[in-house]
Structure formats: C-alpha cells, structure tokens
C-alpha cells in the first residue's frame, strides 16, 4: 500500500508527486510544481528544489540553507489558497499556506503564507520568487480549521 502524498492532495504519493521528484514527469502548471516542491521539503529532496528553481537565480548557492531548512522543519500540511495567471501565458502565481514546526525556534506550529511566482521556460515551470502574505488576526486561519487566525495558528 502506497503512502498518502505529503502535499495534501488526497492522492497516493506514487500517483501524485513522486513522478516529479524522480524526474519521470514535469509539472504541467504552477500549482502542480508548488505541490511537488512542498513534498520535496517534506522529503528533504534538496536536489529537486534546486532543479525546479529558475536557473537564472543561481539556486545552487542556496543548497546549504535549503538543506538546513529541510532538516530543522517538520512540515505538517499544505493548503493551496489561490492560483492566478501572470501577465503572459508563461507566468503564473500560487498562493499557499504551509504549516510546520521549526525545531530550532519555538517548537510550536507556524504558518507560512506566500504568493509564489512561477515562470515557464523551454516548456518547464520554475519557481522564481515569492512574497510572504500576512494573515489578519480576524481572517479565517489558512490551515482550514474554520477558526479565526488569532484563535488558531496565530496564537
């Protein structure tokens, strides 16, 4: 029996993100690349994270900090909040919330919310950059608990 995919898609890992992490397939859209990159963080697959970061940004220079981030974080779940096209067909955005526990900081559940930008080059999507999004205290918590942020992950 196969394990559930860490990206929280509801699919089995071998039918979801595994083909991307093993380079048997390439992501056809930004949201799929986002899910596979999240799974790479969970699985500590730094090589995949580097391979899917836009090469113009020289991602190899981030290898050590990516490896440290993977090692020091326990990823708990991913929620895709929104997807939107960019100014051209080769640009797209994915807003997500990822829950994690940082083992070096507080040992409490944190939520990282980001609007990531992806570019397609030579028929492959790449992560290019992202902007962290603040969740308002009275907004619904991005973890999908149904509670306000201040009563949930924002405590």
From Swiss-Prot:
Belongs to the UPF0225 family. PANTHER family: ADENYLATE CYCLASE-ASSOCIATED CAP C-TERMINAL DOMAIN-CONTAINING PROTEIN, UPF0225 PROTEIN SCO1677. NCBIfam families: PRK01617.1, PRK01752.1. This is UPF0225 protein PC1_1977. It comes from Pectobacterium carotovorum subsp. carotovorum (strain PC1).
